[in-house]
């Protein structure tokens, strides 16, 4: 159930991101989207340290983009659209209602899972802690690790290109 709510929030953030016009609000939406993605990754991998590292890397990239945007954009006023806020709230509530109506056994499964988790929490905690670090380099998640390495390399190249001393947007003004 938690995974479903987080995925719905990711979907709604994607819709909201397409409606944003101000670069700083786009950066904020991208940061929230990254946080939700890290939550989903942490829940699936059962080890949040990988999600924490991923979030810190994206945060570093976002800080570089923030410096770039603030040096280029003028002092535009940032206003929140009431219509966009209501649209996202209605979309989220409507999607949750549709999920509950279409899947009548979802609530029953949720209650059964909560009861089962109470009993198996201690046994699984010991076994999962041993295997959770091994999962990072095995098949399903090794692709995420390779993607992270490529992202870091691309971010390094972009950072070097942006921060050239006399040619980039961060050059000193005369």
From Swiss-Prot:
Subcellular location: Mitochondrion membrane
Transmembrane segments: 25-45, 48-68, 82-102, 143-163
InterPro entries linked: ComplexI_Subunit6
Record-level Gene Ontology MF annotations: NADH dehydrogenase (ubiquinone) activity
Entry EC no(s): 7.1.1.2
Membrane topology field: Multi-pass membrane protein
GO cellular component assignments: mitochondrial membrane; mitochondrion
Chief location bin: mitochondrion
Domain of life: Eukaryota
Uppermost EC category: translocase
Alphabetic keyword roster: Electron transport, Membrane, Mitochondrion, NAD, Respiratory chain, Translocase, Transmembrane, Transmembrane helix, Transport, Ubiquinone
Catalytic activity of the protein: a ubiquinone + NADH + 5 H(+)(in) = a ubiquinol + NAD(+) + 4 H(+)(out)
Family: Belongs to the complex I subunit 6 family.
Annotated function: Core subunit of the mitochondrial membrane respiratory chain NADH dehydrogenase (Complex I) that is believed to belong to the minimal assembly required for catalysis. Complex I functions in the transfer of electrons from NADH to the respiratory chain. The immediate electron acceptor for the enzyme is believed to be ubiquinone.
Name of the protein described by the UniProt record: NADH-ubiquinone oxidoreductase chain 6
Organism encoding this protein: Anopheles gambiae (African malaria mosquito)
């Amino acid at each position: 159930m938690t995974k479903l709510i987080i995925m719905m929030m990711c979907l709604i953030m994607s819709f909201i991101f397409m409606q944003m016009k101000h670069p700083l609000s786009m950066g904020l939406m991208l940061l929230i989207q990254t946080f939700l993605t890290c939550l989903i990754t942490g829940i699936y991998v059962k080890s949040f340290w990988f999600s924490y590292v991923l979030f810190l890397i994206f945060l570093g990239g976002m800080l570089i983009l923030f410096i770039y945007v603030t040096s280029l954009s003028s002092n535009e006023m940032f206003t929140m659209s009431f219509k966009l806020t209501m649209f996202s709230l209605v979309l989220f509530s409507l999607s949750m209602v549709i999920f509950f109506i279409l899947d009548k056994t979802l609530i029953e499964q949720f209650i059964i899972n909560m009861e089962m988790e109470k009993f198996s929490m201690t046994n699984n905690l010991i076994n999962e802690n041993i295997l959770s670090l091994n999962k990072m380099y095995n098949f399903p998640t090794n692709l995420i690790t390779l993607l992270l390495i490529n992202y870091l390399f691309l971010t390094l190249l972009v950072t070097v290109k942006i921060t050239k001393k006399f040619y980039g947007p961060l050059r000193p003004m005369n």
